[in-house]
Amino acid sequence: MAKSKGARIIVTLECTECRTNPDKRSPGVSRYTSTKNRRNTTNRLELKKFCTHCNKHTVHKEIK
């Protein structure tokens, strides 16, 4: 029998304000990678992280 990979997966978090705000410090979209446990956190991850393009702390949401 093959061993299962487990419930922990790598997800990408993207800044929500970079997509909508045209007057930001530099062009581009801030992205972070993180891990989450699929069994404990079934819904999409949402964390407050520092965005280097907006130059402030913003909400970063999980993308596919």
From Swiss-Prot:
One of its GO terms (cellular component) is ribosome. One of its GO terms (molecular function) is structural constituent of ribosome. One of its GO terms (biological process) is translation. The keyword Cell inner membrane does not apply. InterPro entries: Ribosomal_bL33, Ribosomal_bL33_CS, Ribosomal_bL33_sf, Ribosomal_zn-bd. It comes from the Bacteria. The keyword Ribosomal protein applies. Keywords: Ribonucleoprotein, Ribosomal protein. Signal peptide: none annotated. Belongs to the bacterial ribosomal protein bL33 family. HAMAP family: Ribosomal_bL33 (MF_00294). This is Large ribosomal subunit protein bL33. The lineage of its organism: Bacteria, Bacillati, Cyanobacteriota, Cyanophyceae, Nostocales.
